[in-house]
Swiss-Prot record:
It comes from the Bacteria. GO terms for molecular function: ATP binding; four-way junction DNA binding; four-way junction helicase activity. Residues 147-155 are annotated as: Flexible linker. Disulfide bonds: none annotated. This is Holliday junction branch migration complex subunit RuvA. Homotetramer. Forms an RuvA(8)-RuvB(12)-Holliday junction (HJ) complex. HJ DNA is sandwiched between 2 RuvA tetramers; dsDNA enters through RuvA and exits via RuvB. An RuvB hexamer assembles on each DNA strand where it exits the tetramer. Each RuvB hexamer is contacted by two RuvA subunits (via domain III) on 2 adjacent RuvB subunits; this complex drives branch migration. In the full resolvosome a probable DNA-RuvA(4)-RuvB(12)-RuvC(2) complex forms which resolves the HJ. Transmembrane segments: none annotated. The RuvA-RuvB-RuvC complex processes Holliday junction (HJ) DNA during genetic recombination and DNA repair, while the RuvA-RuvB complex plays an important role in the rescue of blocked DNA replication forks via replication fork reversal (RFR). RuvA specifically binds to HJ cruciform DNA, conferring on it an open structure. The RuvB hexamer acts as an ATP-dependent pump, pulling dsDNA into and through the RuvAB complex. HJ branch migration allows RuvC to scan DNA until it finds its consensus sequence, where it cleaves and resolves the cruciform DNA. One of its GO terms (cellular component) is Holliday junction helicase complex. The gene is ruvA. InterPro entries: DNA_helicase_Holl-junc_RuvA_I, NA-bd_OB-fold, RuvA, RuvA_2-like, RuvA_C, RuvA_C_sf.
Amino acid sequence: MIGYLKGQILSLSEDSVLILVNGVGYEVNCAPVAVSALEEGQETALYIAESISPYDGTVLYGFLTKEDKQLWAIFKTSIPNTGAKKALEYLNKALRSVADFHNAIVKKDPKILTGIFGFTAKTAEKLIHSLDGKMDAVTIAGVPKIKIEGEAPFMSEVMMALTALGYSPMEARKAIDQLYKTGLANDSVENIIRAALRILKK
């Protein structure tokens, strides 16, 4: 069983990598967010998990860290009707901010899962139910960026709006933090979003 590959990247697609190891090219499925961090020609290392598909035989899934592989495995084994490919889709969304995803599951907050990570309401509820108590086993790097204790409740709406426009949770968080410093965070939701966009476009 293959557990780790280290070699040169021959080619990239949106969700896969062709990596050359000792003269052999391995096609590895990866989360698109992980693929975006790689470049053709560079040397890289991937943690590997194998999955058996009735149509494709043995399929390789690759991860940049052991923690990503661990989270994918939890999705695959804990969430009903979730195979290797679907687990990778969930992982790709969670990798936007693993600390915030963990926080949303622990606090049972479907709004963060739908607004920030793009899950449907039905899937968000399924994730919260299925992963209850399971996320404790995951090693979390970083700290949550989405919400601060004592923050105005409508700030989650601002976060959702900014991430829906393509900004990362970290970028949105920094813009909101700046608004708090200037006192503009007490305005209406619409005006706060406009002010945050002005900051982000500088």
